[in-house]
Amino acid sequence: MEHTKKFKSLNLHGFDRSTEDYGKRPFVLTAKLLEDQKKAIYGCAFNQYAGIDEEQAVATVGGSFLHMYSVPIDINNIELQWSCNFPTDKSSKVEREESLFTVTWCYDTYEAENDRNPFKVVTGGTLGHIYVIDYVSRKLSNRLRSVGWEINDIRTCPANSNLIVCASSDQSIRIHHIRNEACLIVIGGLECHAGTILSVDWSTDGDFILSCGFDHQLMEWDLSVKQVKEHLERACKALHQDKINVLTQSQDIPYVSKGTMRKSAVSRNIPDKEEDQLLELHRELIPRPSCLLPIYTPSSVSTDMHSDYVDCIRFLIGTNYALSKGCGNEKAIHFWRFGPPKGEVENRIHGNVLRPKSCTTKFRTMNVPSGSAWFIKFAVDPRRRWLVCGGAGGSVMFFDLRNNEETNPTHTCSVGSRTVRQASFSTCGRFLVLVTDEGFVCRFDRVSASVDAKDLAKF
């Protein structure tokens, strides 16, 4: 109770608060919760579609469980709303246990137009299934398939809230619509990553995807080309209906016509009802054209930015700048973009113009002292001020993105004794949640520059 009084006295989220942050301690740890399963929690995500002044909801995943929490504004607490369990895969001959690694939120536009709950929670992990759960009913809305191995990262398209992209250990990237079981686009092949893909992200306009993984490479995939845009538009239009899973993922077999059959009575100008009936039968039996569009070649590739595994990559919101984290022996986050410095042109005269671009411009490197462990996802503040990254030994590191000269964390703290796996900001930027290998869910609140330092020291 005394702790709650101190929290309220800070008035961290009052409307009279300054928009500037308290530099020495930009965020304060206000709540910490241990999940009942007491297993490692690998992923967390705020509902990015919640209003700024609405109570924020955050999902966490670890083991076979998905937990849903609310983050009240005026109380320093993390309140459990509900949870669900995905224990085993009974569809296979050998039962395998699910272990969830990543989670995101989607907004189903068809449900919204029909005055039904549009919020969906999407998660995946070891079994390669993508589960779409209705936030209100808590029931499984859809199960997306086609991924061949573990799912390591799922991200929602900022420009189309029905689309997700996932990174898989099967060395492929897939784009799904949450209302269709089969994927719409598969990215892979000889020009793709040569190992497990650990992380992906969309550009703000949805035209590009970044990817990274075990092979140290950074890749950019162009979705703005006409063929890809038209394919996605057709698919989204077909799926904008009450029925789900209407598109099939089969071999793109040409539509059967009389021209593709043996020389028939048509060429002899003699009616042949039997052949016409056979033609109709072929049309019924042969699947419709596939909803799957393959992409084999990235638009840009970097092979020398990182020297070890790259386990997290993110676009800086609203820009074409990127942040990527190396682990193992590297332990650093790089701030960069594809393309030459401003005013310069990439020289490709002696190269194959059909090959991906390889030029990059690096602006800054941030050291991550306790970042040797892999599968740690950082988060970028929606206000583009702070980058927060977890590390081994429960460490949490805050980097000031406005201070280009600083290479080390501006502020560090500890939330436990084991690795912090992921950080997630609320859309308003006032709340931060982190999850750990110990099973802790940790809440941080943003500290305004106008907060009395004496009051903050008491908390």
UniProtKB/Swiss-Prot annotation:
GO biological process: heterochromatin formation; negative regulation of gene expression; negative regulation of transcription by RNA polymerase II; regulation of gene expression
GO cellular component: ESC/E(Z) complex; nucleosome; PcG protein complex
Segments passing through the bilayer: none
Keyword Cell membrane recorded: no
A Pfam short name: WD40
Organs and tissues of expression: In adults, it is predominantly expressed in the germline, and weakly expressed in intestinal cells.
Keyword Cytoplasm tagged: no
Function: Polycomb group (PcG) protein. PcG proteins act by forming multiprotein complexes, which are required to maintain the transcriptionally repressive state of homeotic genes throughout development. In association with the nfya-1-NF-Y complex, may play a role in repressing the expression of the homeobox protein egl-5 in tissues such as the head. PcG proteins are not required to initiate repression, but to maintain it during later stages of development. The mes-2/mes-3/mes-6 complex may participate in the global inactivation of the X chromosomes in germline cells.
Family: Belongs to the WD repeat ESC family.
Subunit-structure text: Interacts directly with the N-terminal domain of mes-2. Forms a heterotrimeric complex with mes-2 and mes-3. Does not interact with mes-4.
Protein name: Polycomb protein mes-6
Source organism of this protein record: Caenorhabditis elegans
